[in-house]
Amino acid sequence: MTESQQLVNKLWNYCNILRDDGLSYGDYVEQLTYLLFLKMDDERTKEPYNHKSDIPKKYNWQTLLDREGSELEAQYIETLQELGKEEGIIGVIFRKAQNKIQDPAKLRRLIVELINKENWLSLEADVKGDAYEGLLEKNAADVKGGAG
């Protein structure tokens, strides 16, 4: 199994857990996109990149890692809302963003066990692209299979 396939399977397995709570594939990919953006921004601020983040410190990746339960859920909701008000590309990415993950324990698991365990910037661009494409393909196949 390739690195891309392993990553798609990990992402997909977690998606199935969230689907039990009524989260659609589209919603999952959307939430994953927001969280991955925050995680990759955090990675860019560290060695060997050392870039300055455009995300205000009170809404960065670490603020999500530092919280659990209802505090995590509240922080995530506030982060999405406030980043949507930012100028430039940050505001565009997060405009009208909403939390769709209703279970704070599952949100924490997604953040800590899935997203935070990977160093996303070190992955080849093809791996990230393949993973995203794989999720979209699985989504399309599932929607097509369920449309009967």
Range-by-range predicted roles:
Residues 1-148:
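Non-catalytic, mostly N-terminal accessory regions of nucleic-acid modification and defense proteins
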